[in-house]
């Protein structure tokens, strides 16, 4: 009842020709990763030093509850890939052949029968690997620093949250917020020096 062009099409799991509660299946994944891991690397060569922290998680999913409707906005992905009618079709029943219509039509969240219950269309894999921290340093030669009256001078550059590899795309895969209402982790880059007298 109430189906319109551009709605999500559900699979008739039990094959009775009716889409109803009997077609629901259990989802064994949650928002909690099954695996968390990380690796710390520390190396030095002559006057150079290098430190890195790589972390990741796998086995979790995130259900996207977009704030579509009168009081919110779509994620860009949903807007760009939404179903659109063919402008040459007066009935508005055929999809636009020139548009990427891999998603459903634009919708009001509170009015759609297919958004009221969780479904796999809005479920996203949150597996990721992130370069959480990276630092490269250089200690000036002691012969140079002692002439300047300095015991040690180290120049360094470091960064945090520099790279993230994931297929999630909509928001930070570490976030547990389903609609993106949070401050994302900042990408930070520093240049500095440390002195010892």
Tell me what each language-model feature is.
Residues 2-5, 57-149, 153-154:
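Extracytoplasmic gating/loop element in the C-terminal half of outer-membrane beta-barrel translocons
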């Amino acid at each position: 009842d109430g189906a319109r062009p551009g709605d999500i099409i559900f699979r008739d799991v039990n094959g009775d020709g009716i889409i109803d509660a009997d077609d629901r299946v259990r989802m064994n994944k949650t928002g909690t990763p099954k695996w968390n891991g990380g690796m710390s690397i520390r190396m030095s060569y002559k006057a150079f030093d290098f430190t890195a922290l790589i972390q990741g998680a796998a086995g979790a999913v995130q259900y996207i509850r977009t704030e579509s409707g009168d009081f919110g906005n779509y994620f860009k992905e949903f807007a760009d890939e939404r179903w659109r009618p063919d402008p040459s079709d007066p009935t508005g029943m055929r999809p636009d052949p020139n548009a990427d219509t891999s998603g459903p039509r634009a919708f009001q969240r509170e009015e759609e029968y297919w958004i009221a219950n969780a479904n796999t269309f809005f479920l996203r894999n949150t597996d990721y690997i992130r370069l959480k921290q990276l630092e490269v340093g250089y200690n000036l030669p002691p012969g140079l620093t002692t002439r300047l009256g300095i015991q040690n001078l180290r120049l360094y550059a470091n960064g945090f949250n520099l790279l993230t590899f994931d297929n999630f795309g909509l928001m930070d895969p570490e976030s547990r917020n389903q609609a993106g209402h949070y401050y994302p982790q900042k990408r930070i880059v520093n240049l500095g020096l440390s002195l010892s007298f």
